[in-house]
Amino acid sequence: MMYSFIARNKINTFLILFVFILACGGFGLLAGRFLGMSFFLFILLLAAGYACVQYFFSGRLAVLMSGARKISRNDNPRLWNTVENLSITTGLPMPEVYIVDDPAPNAFATGRDPKHAKVAATSGLLEILDDSELEGVMAHEMGHVKNYDIRVSTIVFGLVSAVGLISDMVLRALIWGDNRREGNSAFSFVIVLFFSLLAPIAAMLVQLAVSREREYLADATGALTTRYPAALASALAKLEGNARPLQRQSSSMAHLWISNPMPRGFFRKLFSTHPPTEERIRRLKEMGNQF
């Protein structure tokens, strides 16, 4: 059942991305009518370049924004040995290990592929979790590495950036351009205006949906690695019970953390990069019945 859950999650992500890419293509062709194809292609290249920068430098940016410090085995043998054992178990290269000096319990993984992976845990996380729970959390993070989630999120980020840029340019063209002279009907004008306003919101919602699916997948991958889903479920319950905002908050890297680091509230719930903790725990308990 656990393998089928992992496969189903990957299929869900693929379907979301497939439909999103088709929608982006349709919106792009529609926008090209108003912007001109040469300008449209320029925007696509600009968005792709922006995504590439994010892809290659995402690890360094995450470390800088979080204030994480790189450690060796002697600095924190407990965390280091946990990650090392998981690296051996999964067959992945040993990632760089970091600690974020922050009382808020949390952890994240970043890096464009397993060879450039970085994993980090906050000091608050290390204080409240026992060894099996810590292993469960770090197995979740190694799951992100194994599933190439940074690559997936970069693809989505590039598409969202392209949609945002195209939408902005189309709106400017509609407001300031003389589209009637180009033979565009009033109906076409309204349709393009509608999609230009709606597209960025829809793109953001797709990005959030993909992020939530990858969290479920990392949970399942981590549980399969340790063969002890209850440990991760217990850790998530502790993280929820001891949740507090990080001292160095950044909404741009909120999706990287195992627990949503943003302050609680209506908008956090509405635009969350993470699925509900209760549902994650329920699924992990269901997986636990398989062992």
Swiss-Prot record:
Subcellular localization: Cell membrane
Transmembrane segments: 11-31, 34-54, 155-175, 186-206
Cofactor annotation: Zn(2+)
Record CDD domains: M48B_Htpx_like
Pfam families per the UniProt record, alphabetical: Peptidase_M48
Active site (UniProt): E141
Binding note for cofactor: Binds 1 zinc ion per subunit.
InterPro entries: HtpX_protease, Pept_M48_protease_HtpX, Peptidase_M48
Keyword Metal-binding annotated: yes
Keywords from the UniProt entry: Cell membrane, Hydrolase, Membrane, Metal-binding, Metalloprotease, Protease, Transmembrane, Transmembrane helix, Zinc
GO BP annotations, alphabetical order: proteolysis
One term of GO molecular function: metalloendopeptidase activity
Principal EC category: hydrolase
Presence of keyword Zinc: yes
Gene Ontology terms: cellular component: plasma membrane
Membrane topology: Multi-pass membrane protein
Protein residues bound to Zn(2+): H140, H144, E215
This enzyme's EC code(s): 3.4.24.-
UniProt xrefs under PANTHER family: PROTEASE HTPX (PTHR43221:SF1)
Family classification: Belongs to the peptidase M48B family.
UniProt name for this protein: Protease HtpX homolog
Organism: Tropheryma whipplei (strain Twist)
